[in-house]
């Protein structure tokens, strides 16, 4: 239609492409990203809530074999009897505990009649210059511990382990990476000690049950994806209305003069 021909101008075509790209990103990237974070947070909150109301269970019921992992039982309290490997410890660096930097101290624990599992003993604060402070020794005798089951973390890309102050140091608690460093085969999940446990250090608390803003952000991106093409349509309609008003307000074109009018205009009218 001629009245819509202006939409084929470069400016309108560029605007339409921007709106289409923005809408596509809203529905396929931005909204799913926030909704996925909301689903993860809701799942973790549910696991924490369940763990607070459930008594500890033997570790071997959730990790029966050496290659076992239990992502559906994260934060669940478990008990295990066995021995630490005191000469094989690794530090997780650049951890934030109560708003301050900390090291988390990791050590393998051999469960009697069960798997060898990585144990997060807790945290210690770094000395000046991010150096490792003196770390209390582990017990060498058989002990029984109570801890929370945790999922192995993904390794940090581009951040390789290194040795400093006599300790292997890593940037995440990835059981596969720690197993490769120590040469000790570890289960897929690890343990985080609760308070007053043998070999424990600074206690790592349970996260607050906060759903976060992710659901509202996801809904907002969906709304933006809906409103963007509506806005484009509104501006196109407004342009059409403006052109109609401009056309209606312009004076009608002059009618062509007849031969008599031309002669009269040139020689004058007869009296």
From Swiss-Prot:
InterPro entries: Surf1/Shy1, Surf1/Surf4. GO terms for cellular component: peptidoglycan-based cell wall; plasma membrane. It comes from the Bacteria. It is a multi-pass membrane protein. GO terms for biological process: biological process involved in interaction with host. Keywords: Cell membrane, Membrane, Transmembrane, Transmembrane helix. The keyword Cell membrane applies. Residues 262-271 have a biased composition (Basic and acidic residues). The chain crosses the membrane at residues 11-33, 172-194, 214-236. Pfam families: SURF1. Residues 245-271 are annotated as: Disordered. It is found in: Cell membrane. Belongs to the SURF1 family. This is Uncharacterized SURF1-like protein Rv2235. It comes from Mycobacterium tuberculosis (strain ATCC 25618 / H37Rv). The lineage of its organism: Bacteria, Bacillati, Actinomycetota, Actinomycetes, Mycobacteriales.
